[in-house]
Regions:
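Short alpha-helical
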Residues: 11, 26, 37, 64, ...
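Basic/aromatic recognition patch in beta-strand/loop cores that engages polyanionic ligands
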Residues: 36-37, 41-77, 81
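Solvent-exposed interaction patches of small proteins and small membrane subunits
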Residues: 27-30, 50, 54, 79-80, ...
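Alpha-helical interaction segments
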Residues: 8-10, 21, 53, 58-60, ...
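Generic structural signal for secondary-structure transition and capping sites
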Residues: 18, 25, 40, 44-47, ...
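Enriched for short, Lys/Arg-rich terminal
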Residues: 66, 70-107
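Arg/Lys-rich, positively charged N-terminal/basic patches that mediate binding to nucleic acids
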Residues: 1-32, 107
Length: 107
């Protein structure tokens, strides 16, 4: 099934466009074409990517961005499109608190 973007993922994509737009129309076009190609691939390859921060994670080739998604009834739901140059804490915070249930005991 075709991927669906959440409102937050759409906002992330707008931020990415804002970053690339001043660098030239061809750079922005290349980024958007690469992203569109990855969305086409995601339709066929959903669920094969490793999980990071509790979500499947797929890289966008040629650009330092990753697409974080979940599967709902075999439909990929894109939760975020994030710059890989963000630190791990910022990426994790994007998704809210992650609760760890299997904490080793201190005894």
């Amino acid at each position: 099934m075709a991927p669906k973007l959440t409102a937050l993922a759409e906002f992330d994509l707008v931020e990415a466009q804002d970053f690339y737009a001043p660098k030239g129309a061809w750079v922005l076009d290349h980024f958007m074409n690469s992203f569109a190609d990855e969305m086409d691939d995601l339709e066929r390859q959903a669920g094969i990517h490793p999980k990071h921060y509790g979500h499947y994670c797929m890289s966008v080739p040629h650009f330092p961005f990753s697409v974080y998604y979940d599967l709902e009834d075999e439909t990929p739901i894109v939760k975020a499109v994030l710059d890989n140059r963000f630190g791990p804490a910022r990426i994790a915070a994007h998704f809210g608190p992650i609760w760890v249930t299997d904490m080793p005991s201190g005894n």
